[in-house]
Amino acid sequence: MSRSDTEPDHAGERRSLMRVLVFAYACEPDKGSEPGAGWVWSRMLARMGEVWVITRESNREVIEAALPSVPEAGALHFEYVDLPRRARFWKRGARGARVYYVFWQVAALRRARRLSQAISFDLVWHLTWANAWLGGLAPLLPGRFVYGPVGGGVGMDWNFVTVLGIRGAVFEVARALSRAGARFLNPLARLPWRRADLILVQNPETRAWLPARHREKALVFPHIVVEEGAGWMGPRPETPTKNALFVGRLLPWKGVALALRVLVLLPDWTLTIGGDGYDERRLRRLARRLKVEDRVAFLGWLTPDRVHDLMREGSDVLLFPSLHDEGGWVIAEALATGLPVVCLDRGGPPAIGGSGVPCKGVSQTVAALAQAVVTAAGRATGGFPSIHSSSVRLQSILRSRFPALSFAETWSPPMES
């Protein structure tokens, strides 16, 4: 039984506030990427009104453990939905997970329709796994519909295909064909664009990828949000040698091959790589071929605490030359520690706050990245997307788009003792 099945009637002062029904397939506290976005954005919405979140049954334990400790708990209600155990085999691999997700949406839609019979929702919101070429079923519900933050619009710059390796190049060709086909042939992709009253997109490329008639209702709003108390700002300790840090999956499109080439141009620097993935073997071979293997440390998968330690004390720059990241949770985490970020001027990282280097072919881009790394080292970072600042901005957008709705007063974070 879900939390909302057992709770008493809500306090009278919240009854007049907006009621939001959220589809958040991924939603887990203390996580990055999509699960973290589902949790933090649900909390942000609960600062403005009453929120019902439909998520996976597998998320129940961690959500119920964390919920009592968050100040928005009284306005958050979770409904847990999953497919029968015999259908779980679909989740094997990335493609299988997408198939499973489509069927999960059918089950979530059934639960949402039952909820809508008992509760009049002001907004229906497709929150996580919002992919512009995958789509969703949430807009089939009555009422105003908000879609996003949506990703999926960042394409490949084919000038960089030579740094991907054969497997990476094949993946990019398949991805490009899938994106093109889904845009024109997938009715589930077109449905949210058409029905949305507001579309939030993670980056400018995704807004440009939408059909022109839908772009005027799309705003750039990255889904990356850092919780209060997650910043480690302050004077950064001196490091004995200059070190660039990369954190992420070791996949060809993540751009680690570019980072290794940058190291060739920076003989006084080292590179620490945190993450694992199938591209690691190729990257180790490349480091040997470039004669930089003695200045590269492959650390494998790292715990969040270890990542934060490296950001705070062991690095001078986060070098994140991803070729088509929609967001990049690690960008916000680095900025929160005061670590400067150097990235390509593509997709989500520069929208979050990274220093974006224009893409002008491999050699020119590598040289520009090297110069940006040297310039960024020791430079103070700007702000980062906290849950408070993002909540204030989001409420301003919603008030403008939906003036008839009733919102709670702008939230102020509790003072730390």
Language model regions located:
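Aromatic "clamp/platform" in nucleotide-sugar-dependent glycosyltransferases that forms part
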Residues: 323
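Nucleotide-activated donor-binding/catalytic signature segment of Leloir-type glycosyltransferases, i.e.
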Residues: 284-302, 306
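Donor nucleotide-sugar binding/catalytic pocket of nucleotide-sugar-dependent glycosyltransferases
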Residues: 77-79, 147, 178-233, 411
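Short hydrophobic beta-strand element within catalytic cores of glycosyltransferases
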Residues: 317, 331, 340-343
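Membrane-proximal helix-turn-helix segments that form the acceptor-binding/catalytic region
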Residues: 40-43, 110, 153, 168-199
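A conserved mid-protein helix/loop that constitutes part of the nucleotide-sugar donor-binding site
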Residues: 36, 242-265, 278-284
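N-terminal subdomain of nucleotide-sugar transferases
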Residues: 2-74, 416
